[in-house]
């Protein structure tokens, strides 16, 4: 059977919160089959466990924020994206602040951390959410849609009227049957505009943001001396975010995702719309790994790698 996966050993790292600018300690621990991805605020007087779920996402203005009993964990999307890309089903994430550290602004550090811990298959069937009917959410001209597909593919279009972004391509389509998440998506960094960063800092946000963890643009160009990691890094990062946003549904999706100018809020609304229609999805497993869609029947060390 196609099995669930966790990590083999405990791994730790330290980084800074994008908005607080404060040091954050992050510990990843193995979890039993059926646990899911569980975030734990171990810095609180009584630690609070917050399982990743579509219904636990609260604030989505600047990141995807999990909330429970007054506790929050912000900016979970890059770590969730890495878990999706490596096929991790079960994991405890201990964090000492209300933000996951931003690291280099991509998912690459989390991919490295998980691969360093080692990936272990567990004796339980991997569960998928198979989309059986189209589901769509719109907000003005923005939209996000899930449609039936035997695999996982995404098409994302952005629309930033900026000369540097225009040059790199504003649309990307990826099918993980033939694309490596680790090589083609994981290293894409978050990006922002210099004038917006200044405004955010005045509001007490983005205190940890720098060219070490983001692509920064002025009105005309990219300010980072090292340039871009991918020719189309901007739209690839939006896809990286979407993969993480969608993975909070609790299981990998078997679906085709199409989006135009979508963000954390619209992605979460799409998951809630899906879950509200019980006839739009079903939970499936694969007794024969070879019967699973290409890209999911991976060996124990790589998923979309």
From Swiss-Prot:
The active site is at residue 264. GO terms for molecular function: metal ion binding; UDP-3-O-acyl-N-acetylglucosamine deacetylase activity. InterPro entries: Ribosomal_Su5_D2-typ_SF, UDP-acyl_GlcNac_deAcase, UDP-acyl_GlcNac_deAcase_C, UDP-acyl_N-AcGlcN_deAcase_N. Its cofactor is Zn(2+). Its EC number is 3.5.1.108. GO terms for biological process: lipid A biosynthetic process. Keywords: Hydrolase, Lipid A biosynthesis, Lipid biosynthesis, Lipid metabolism, Metal-binding, Zinc. The keyword Membrane does not apply. PANTHER family: UDP-3-O-ACYL-N-ACETYLGLUCOSAMINE DEACETYLASE 1, MITOCHONDRIAL-RELATED. Catalyzes the hydrolysis of UDP-3-O-myristoyl-N-acetylglucosamine to form UDP-3-O-myristoylglucosamine and acetate, the committed step in lipid A biosynthesis. Belongs to the LpxC family. This is UDP-3-O-acyl-N-acetylglucosamine deacetylase. It comes from Burkholderia ambifaria (strain ATCC BAA-244 / DSM 16087 / CCUG 44356 / LMG 19182 / AMMD) (Burkholderia cepacia (strain AMMD)). The lineage of its organism: Bacteria, Pseudomonadati, Pseudomonadota, Betaproteobacteria, Burkholderiales.
């Amino acid at each position: 059977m196609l099995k669930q996966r966790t990590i083999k050993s405990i791994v730790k790292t330290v980084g800074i919160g994008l908005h607080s600018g404060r040091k954050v300690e992050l510990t990843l621990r193995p979890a039993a089959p059926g646990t899911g991805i569980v975030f734990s605020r171990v810095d609180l007087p009584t630690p609070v466990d917050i399982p990743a779920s579509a219904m636990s996402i609260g604030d989505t203005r600047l990141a995807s924020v999990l909330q429970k009993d007054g506790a929050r964990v912000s900016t979970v999307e890059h770590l969730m994206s890495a878990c999706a890309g490596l096929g991790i089903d079960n994991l405890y994430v201990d964090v000492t602040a209300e933000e996951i550290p931003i690291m280099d602004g991509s998912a690459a550090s989390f991919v490295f951390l998980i691969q360093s811990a080692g990936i272990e298959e567990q004796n339980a069937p991997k569960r998928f959410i198979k989309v059986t009917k189209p589901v769509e959410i719109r907000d003005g001209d923005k939209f996000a849609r899930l449609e039936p597909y035997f695999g996982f593919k995404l098409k994302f279009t952005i629309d930033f009227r900026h000369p540097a972004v225009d040059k790199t391509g504003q649309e990307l389509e990826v099918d993980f049957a033939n694309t490596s998440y680790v090589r083609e998506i994981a290293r894409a960094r978050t990006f922002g505009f210099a004038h917006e960063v200044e405004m955010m800092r005045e509001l007490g946000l983005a205190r940890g943001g720098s060219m070490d963890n983001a692509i920064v643009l002025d009105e005309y160009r990219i300010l980072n001396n090292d340039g871009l990691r991918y020719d189309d890094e901007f739209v690839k990062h939006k896809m990286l975010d979407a993969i993480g946003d969608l993975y909070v549904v609790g299981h990998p999706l078997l679906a085709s995702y199409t989006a135009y100018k979508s963000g954390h809020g619209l992605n979460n609304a799409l998951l809630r719309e899906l879950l509200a229609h019980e006839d739009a999805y079903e939970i499936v497993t694969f007794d024969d790994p070879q019967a699973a869609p290409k890209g999911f029947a991976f060996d124990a060390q790589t998923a979309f790698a």
